Amino acid sequence: MAFDPTALGPSAEPYLRDVSPGRIWHPLFRHECAFGPDVFEDVMMNLIKNPNINSSWLFRADILHDTDPAWSPSPPPPTSDHPDQQGAVAAVQDVRHEEQHQPIPVAFQDFRNDRVLVRRLIPRNTRRDDPLEQTCVFASSSPGKDADAAASKTRSLVVYLPHASEPDALPFYHPKVRGVAQLHEWDAARAVGTLSIHYLFFDDADFAVEKLVRTARMLLSVLYKHGQGRVRGYTKRVHHDVVIPQARFQNRYAELKLKYARDLVENWAETTDPSKHVFEDLGIAAFLIELWADMYRGQEFPGFVDIGCGNGLLVYILLEEGYSGWGFDARARKSWAKYNKVRDGKDSLQRLVLLPDAVSRPSHEDGREPALDLSQIHNGAFPKGTFIVSNHADELTPWTPILAAQSGSPFIMIPCCSHNLGGHKYRAPPPRDKTKSPSTYSCLVDWAARIAEDCGWVVETEMLRIPSTRNTAMLGRRRTRDAEEVGIDGVLAKYGGTGGYFESAAKLTRTEKGH
């Protein structure tokens, strides 16, 4: 059933009776639905926790108060390590759990309040918009045993009340109304339901404001779409925030964006789109910083290496944030002139070609190997514990868990283009999970995960919140067995061998052709 709601004009009789005098909730749209109260409440809770579904201006919602006995406040996110940045991101990071976030009282005739929450809406850009606290109320009304046909429906209601006393106090991303109510009515005998959306206006004349009416229609359409999707058996395939909580990642990302984004975009030296690459690398940096905070709490950071580092921006950001490390790529980039740092006499960005010791050497009839410039070769052996970063490293992606096993190093790999261990373009076999798409990217991700597992790694997967469709990150930080028990030669043979890699590496040491 396509979404085609019935518009209800200003003269429509209210469906809801607020017990407070003078508070009139005007219905705007109504639509039939095929899902019951449980689905309605589940969808609404998801929308409360994830307001970014309704508005791209929003990051998330932090739950500050909840009458559910099972709820407990989340720990406050870590504060900035940079005092000069604390003021700029205070609006995002200032979650004071010792404060009392009192909900706005509301009650409706014939309804009982089942659950009351207070959420803080966190905008993407705190320079443009302020966070907003909002009371969210779940209420319900069940038919009595002797109810007539008109009153035989189960009614479920979710109400949003912004903590603002006047329209000008509301940020851009929130409709300028005193309250929003979404009502679900369910006729169990006929298995038919209806949805409707209602506004509590600051001024009843606001019913004529087209933007408010358009927003109401959009909110109802999202609720309808998600509810109907549950009926059709939709299950969420992508799960974010498995490794790092959403609030921590987004707070760190907001901090980095405020600190670096404008300068990086305005002074972009490459021909590629800065709006994509800058925010993508800021997101990856934010994830790594929070990951490392967990992994190395109370320990000295062991350093990182970014293999196939490309333009070097990720290395630059991490160094600026105080992490020791370096990166290399087969081809230097224009950006390196700005991003490179010299520490202890060594460049942070180096032109090197990866040639692992495990790569088979070709045999020639005359007994000679292709000439190598050894000064431009790295054998893939790193100091034990060095964190290996492999971000869209293409030919180096399948080598990442192998090098990590040999060096005793944890890693992150974010695959992009599919290549085999010989460095050639390659279509990996279909994923083991037959419910997943057999796309080239899904095949690559599963194939790389298989290699990692065969190298003895427990593979953790996180769908990064970055502006890229190639956003699957795989982590290796725990092992199923010691590296000595892994037969690397057997792994290489199982996944097609390394034929052609040596010759390609030899050419790269003599040319500027990159990955």
Where are these regions (language model features)?
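Short, hydrophobic/aromatic alpha-helical segments in well-folded domains
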Residues: 270-271, 287, 304, 313-314, ...
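Domain-scale recognition of functional cores that engage charged ligands
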Residues: 277-282, 308-314, 319
